Amino acid sequence: GSLATASEKTRESLLRQLGDLKIMMPRNYNELGRFYGVSATAGIVEETLWRGYMFWYLGHVMPLWAAAIVTSVIFGFGHIYQGIANVAKIILVGGVFAGLYLLTGSLWLPMLLHAVFDAVQGKAVYGLLSSASSNPSSSASSRIRGS
């Protein structure tokens, strides 16, 4: 009925928004497990680089609030491959991580939240891609397979 049609339209809209990023996203259970590993690595490495090193370095030459803004903007544009529309969102997320680092004095919470944030997004996209590819009549399914 109309609910299934609305659901299919929503799914197709989300798949269009993913664009070229689909190739990087998990499509099956094995890839999902690997994606979780990548998420953990991104949380640790990116937070160490952006909040641990760059923020620390800039904090010596500018006020901490300015260092938080600068590192968040650079962090956001470092994710430009996700599309310009997502850069602003990622800048805000970087600002939250910088704020958590300032509040706690530790990278552990930003690392953990970064990893969880990435993993949750990967799981959501996995659900989207696996449901689209399991529905062979879906036009979204044919686009995922490259048909």
Protein language model annotation of sequence segments:
Residues 19-147:
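Transmembrane helix-loop-helix hairpins at the membrane interface
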